[in-house]
Amino acid sequence: MPAMSHQQRKLTTAAIVVLAATLVGIGPGRSEEKGPPVEFWKGHFARDAQAFHDWDNVKEIPAVCSRCHGADKVPEYLKEGKNTPAQHVKNGFACTNCHADLLTYERYNVPKVTFPGGFTIDSGHNDTNLCMTCHQGRESTASVNKAIAGLALDTPDTKLNFLHVHYFPAGATRYGTEAKVAYEYENKTYVGRFAHMPNVSTCTGCHQPHTGEVKIDRCGGCHDGINTVADLANIRMSTRGDFDGNGKEEGLAREIANLQDQLYAAIQTYSANVGGTPIAFTKAAFPYWYADTNRNGRIDPEEMKMANKYMAYTPRLLQAVFNYTFSVRDPGGAYHNGRYVLQLLYDSLESLAASGKAGVNMSGKVRP
């Protein structure tokens, strides 16, 4: 190997110094402009998170998962359009998963993002496109329609299986019908991208990129009384109406939570009346929706097994379950695009009500 020039040695030394300073959160590489020190136990660096360890008992992280669950597989996806399997992850994402240059902190160039249903979006902001490369979901209106094609709307079919939109599909929520990741009912109109104020119109405008934590101080500039994450539930935006039908207009997060509760109850009632066995949801284990064999309204440990996964889906039930799951998988949905989430929940309830088997009363509810 030829000897390095003086200039090459200087650049190499500088790179090592900056990288070391970055890793320990000190030195010139961690200036005010570069943000706070990296916290290696949160968000993208949550080394013990299940998102990085679900495959510890198998040889490698499968190619279909490695883009977003490998340590540094995003660059491979951006270059090749697909991934190879990844090695097990020890410390969350590597810095090079998002940063193309560790001296300048430049991120990879992402001109556009293709969502699961085939729709392509350019947010106009490179870092947002980079975030949406993973935060987009894995199923869509198209995949649900493909699964239920040709089937009677209210007839159980054991060939139907739960379709999981996946975790934190915030990009899909924000772009609404432009991405069509949630299930959109035929002959219904849905909102597209939620256009927020300029300083909070990007992913990193609202979230610390390493930890995902919300920049609460940005919210309080326009919304009075917002000092903590809990206060966010009071934000109403400009949307008017009593969406959940409880007789009062509340913060969008509360309206959404109430509609989620109503939809979940309707799903359970419909499943019992049409499928013969009620369905219930748990976040604890895939595929999350199981048969509630003892009819106590929840999934107990002995029910949480693949042999007990719910197998009496009708097309109507699958649609509603998909949208309920979408709404809970994006805990920030009220702020990413609250109107879109409310439309999904309302339409899912309305569909179940039309069956006459879900015990749903739509009176008093308003569709945004």
Predicted segments, located by residue:
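Mature extracytoplasmic or organellar-lumen-exposed domains after removal of signal/transit peptides
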Residues: 37-41, 230-233, 241-368
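Bacterial N-terminal signal peptides that target proteins for export
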Residues: 4-15
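Divalent metal-coordination and catalytic microenvironments
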Residues: 130, 222, 348
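Bacterial N-terminal signal peptides
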Residues: 14-23
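Short, well-ordered loop/turn and helix-capping segments at boundaries between secondary-structure elements
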Residues: 136, 140, 224-228, 354
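Structured mid-domain segments that build the active-site/substrate or prosthetic-cofactor binding neighborhood
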Residues: 198-238
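Sequence context of c-type cytochrome heme-c attachment sites
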Residues: 27-208, 367
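Short, solvent-exposed secondary-structure capping/transition elements
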Residues: 76-78, 107, 143, 214-215, ...
